[in-house]
Amino acid sequence: MRAKLLGIVLTTPIAISSFASTETLSFTPDNINADISLGTLSGKTKERVYLAEEGGRKVSQLDWKFNNAAIIKGAINWDLMPQISIGAAGWTTLGSRGGNMVDQDWMDSSNPGTWTDESRHPDTQLNYANEFDLNIKGWLLNEPNYRLGLMAGYQESRYSFTARGGSYIYSSEEGFRDDIGSFPNGERAIGYKQRFKMPYIGLTGSYRYEDFELGGTFKYSGWVESSDNDEHYDPGKRITYRSKVKDQNYYSVAVNAGYYVTPNAKVYVEGAWNRVTNKKGNTSLYDHNNNTSDYSKNGAGIENYNFITTAGLKYTF
């Protein structure tokens, strides 16, 4: 099934090119619309560690949480012809934002459901996050008051975090949660980056009644390629972890509502929910203290979900 869907994505440009050869392209001002908006980004991203030698069970998980990071978002769309549109969109954070990180380990194989080690880092920053999206739409219905179309595109997103200070509860070799303490305030503990690359397919549409308009978009990908980089800065455990995961699932739902203040200008609000589901992938580590490295197949997991709310202006030229 995924192979068939990927075939649709790859052959869409060919089909559109063939169709375009029978139509006349007209680059006129009223073929273009653009929008810009401001809003917030909230969500959580997760990294996991699995042990293949213990049946692939999860032994570690780090949850990076962020709330209400300010973002700016923009898009431009060009109607090549009544049936075909191309577009570009993207957003970026306007600065760093405070967050939170929790790191838990399950090292006791005889009691895998109970964590043995935990550290909490309330002094965590979302350093930056951004995304770009290139897409093409084919309109099945295209009337003055409503549109419905299929879409295909390519999207990339990035996230960067730094956790500082914090507290910990560890288990010694002889005990259980018996080592309690804290890290120096402001000292870097862990730095983490994620990147997601994906082709996708989707469905988009809108409906207008007088000066009010509702719209929505659904996107899906089964071909997400994600990667991450985890830097442990502890001088006694200076380790870099890098992981790659392929063919993850991605889901996105966006809904917007707007009002035309002039025939060409619309103010609107929008909410978008996005998720990349967890899947196992390969990981490597490099120990800077010992100059040693290791590699593990199916030893990592990467996941991300977020919610974006924006308010902005759309203008048709």
Curated annotation (Swiss-Prot):
All ranges on the Extracellular side of the membrane: 42-69, 93-130, 157-197, 222-250, 275-306
Regulation: Inhibited by zinc.
Result of changing D230A: Loss of activity
Compartments reported by the entry: Cell outer membrane
Enzyme Commission number: 3.4.23.49
GO MF term set: aspartic-type endopeptidase activity; endopeptidase activity; serine-type endopeptidase activity
Family according to the record: Belongs to the peptidase A26 family.
Subunit structure, interactors included: Homopentamer.
Protein name: Protease 7
Organism: Escherichia coli (strain K12)
UniProt gene name: ompT
